[in-house]
């Protein structure tokens, strides 16, 4: 029998699909990536073609094995991680989508959400699903599809249509329609799932008029769901054995599996998650309660805060303001000045996320004086990412009663040493940057590997979690608090800007 040397992680993201092969030491052996089209039918609407998601993801799987000259019988298992909340509805019989995937960023269901608020459902939704009423989550997207595609609700009631988030869609396709499942982490992002009963919530299904017959079975994040023979020479069937939504996969990939451990992912936005163990901590501070993975993929809970503009604000400096020609230049220019000269940039281009949740806030620059130059604005924009992270962390510590001792970080912007040092300074806590930056794929690989015995337990994985660099606070508490109070003042003035116009 051929030795099972490798694990494959499929990382289906918002703009691209990736496949990553890892060996037993969690080293990356091979990577393949394909971008796909973003569809914008109207302002604020975002769609993907589900068939293109599938084509891009399946081709990266074939490609990544061919590239490394690996046959499918050398693969122990496949793990899947995915963009969360994005909703797909397809025909059970043909596997054909009845509409494009409605992407997590899409705001078309704002009216449905406003109606839910008018109907007094906010508290019920928060208490039972852990989420706020927002177009972000899948439930209102599914309702929209059933409302707008003729005859679809009746077909769904007859069991002819299926719903899934991206993980469910991929597994359905990989198993030729034999397996219709999701995991607890993805289910917890739909606004249809009761995170305490660990089952679909009948009241939410009733309110949104979504037939239970179309919903997938919900399973643990680490177990064998089915097998696929796609991707390899020799047609060996490979177990699909791990699923987690991208942020929960990153939390697991950073091995934040104990209560009080937290990670922040610095991508287009920031996503901070803190594991709260077996208890769902109620948030009084505008955070989401979501399901995360415990040490063997079982249900744990987490607090989650999303910042909308992190890397996106650096792109703004590059693309719209033309202050830098490359995102990497931001560190160089930020360190050419000793501080921001009193400037604060609030990058509320699309409103503010956690803990403010103000869709009417708008971007602003405060504290401008004659001596301010472009380097001060670049530095202040970078600092805004760290301030927003502190906003979320303060809310987490208040809700959980846990004082964070170290923050694990990942994502594109963590390569910026200035930002990471300032993050440590403004939090007053250690910031740990791992050697392997592909933590989302790593999380999916770990979940799959643990399910099939490729790795025995987490102790075996702890040795592989090497911290490449640790940043420690370098400023005094008084200085830290003074700077942060300036940020709070700036945010307050940027809030509710749009409402004044109306």
Curated annotation (Swiss-Prot):
Catalytic function, reaction form: glycerol + ATP = sn-glycerol 3-phosphate + ADP + H(+)
Pathway participation: Polyol metabolism; glycerol degradation via glycerol kinase pathway; sn-glycerol 3-phosphate from glycerol: step 1/1
EC number: 2.7.1.30
Gene Ontology CC terms, in alphabetical order: cytosol
Source superkingdom: Bacteria
Annotated positions binding sn-glycerol 3-phosphate: 14, 84-85, 136, 246
CDD domains per the UniProt record, alphabetical: FGGY_EcGK_like
Binding-site positions, ADP: 14, 18, 268, 311, 412, 416
One term of GO molecular function: glycerol kinase activity
InterPro entries: ATPase_NBD, Carb_kinase_FGGY, Carb_kinase_FGGY_CS, FGGY_C, FGGY_N, Glycerol_kin
Single biological process term from Gene Ontology: glycerol metabolic process
PANTHER family linked: GLYCEROL KINASE (PTHR10196:SF69), SUGAR KINASE (PTHR10196)
Assigned protein family: Belongs to the FGGY kinase family.
Subunit structure: Homotetramer and homodimer (in equilibrium). Heterodimer with EIIA-Glc. Binds 1 zinc ion per glycerol kinase EIIA-Glc dimer. The zinc ion is important for dimerization.
Protein name: Glycerol kinase
Organism: Salmonella typhimurium (strain LT2 / SGSC1412 / ATCC 700720)
Source lineage: Bacteria, Pseudomonadati, Pseudomonadota, Gammaproteobacteria, Enterobacterales
